Amino acid sequence: GTVTVSHKEISKLEKGEPGTRSYSANLVHSVDALILREVVAMAMHQKEVVARVTKLIENKSYQLFSNNKGKDIAMVEKLQSLYKQSGFLSDRILDYLHEGTISLLDKDTIEELKDMLDVINQMGEPFEVMTIHDCFRVLPKHVNAIRKAYIYQLYKIAKTKGKMLNFLLSQLFNMEVNFGFGKLNPEDVLSSDYALC
């Protein structure tokens, strides 16, 4: 027999018009999703990866080896480039760092990476996180660790001093955007007692 599949249009997807508020919602949701991904990655980190990258930095093993993996090089270069443009280093970079790629990182990226590894190590053992949108579920013993990871992501955004917002808005509007930054001290964010509810 023949199987016929048909569909019925229930509602039409409405796209936002340039200059409307829908751009704002998309930007906010994108930043929320970024924070969520980074927090989950920090909580569910792979101990071996964190140990390997920490050792590479401590040993200053920055020479290139002939066994480089092209895709790893390309991804490290891309993530470092995005860091330079936005001021925000994603911990996705950890998965691509090894003896053959660590030398691609400049001094600023290495320093940012050290801070990230320090926070991950302070969080302790990896643990499972369940998420729904921007809601995190963890065992009670991990609540402070997840809160610390969340605050750290907000600190990283604040530390960009508006560079990340300008980067995102420039992509959204396909033109150079350069807003000023207020008087927020990123250290105040880091030392905040922000509570996730």
Residue ranges of model-derived segments:
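Conserved catalytic core of nucleotide polymerization and phosphodiester-bond processing enzymes
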Residues: 1-197
